[in-house]
Amino acid sequence: MYLARTRFLFFLASLACASIIGTAFYLQQTFGLDPCFLCLIQRAAIIACGVLALCAACHAPGPTGMRRYSLGFLLIALTGLVTAGAQVWLQTASADQLIPFITKLEHLLSLLSLDMCIDRLRSDAMFCAEITWTLFGISLPEWSLLAFTGLALLPLYPLFSEFSHWLATKDRARY
């Protein structure tokens, strides 16, 4: 029964991801909101979460496979969560906080021989720091942060319920 519930949750997650991407494209076309570099990473994470959730729902693996799908989903959702959190921080940080951050990031990219990324970083970091649109006083990166938080919580159910099944089996084996 638990695997059927998990498949249904992953199917709902894939629908949620599809609606999030649809909304992002709608806002881009309707309001002319061009995505910045961090927005594109978040979109890629949402698409990856949606595809992985749909695969988990359609594949119907056993407990080990569902655990693997859940861990992969959790890693992708946490990547999006960190990216959205970084963008929210960029939007709320003052110029005094942004300049040292960008300087350290430029230094890191120069150490990695990614000089072509430095010029793009200067323009994109400032572009990502702009608040271009809000709904109920919440900016788009904050909405993304909320969505990724929900998506990161979803795979915890199969992981913890599998852990509780394992503990129950261990207790029964003792007696």
UniProtKB/Swiss-Prot annotation:
It is found in: Cell inner membrane. It comes from the Bacteria. Disulfide bonds join C36-C39. SUPFAM superfamilies: DsbB-like (SSF158442). Keywords: Cell inner membrane, Cell membrane, Chaperone, Disulfide bond, Electron transport, Membrane, Oxidoreductase, Redox-active center, Transmembrane, Transmembrane helix, Transport. GO terms for molecular function: electron transfer activity; protein-disulfide reductase activity. Belongs to the DsbB family. Required for disulfide bond formation in some periplasmic proteins. Acts by oxidizing the DsbA protein. This is Disulfide bond formation protein B 2. It comes from Pseudomonas savastanoi pv. phaseolicola (strain 1448A / Race 6). The gene is dsbB2.
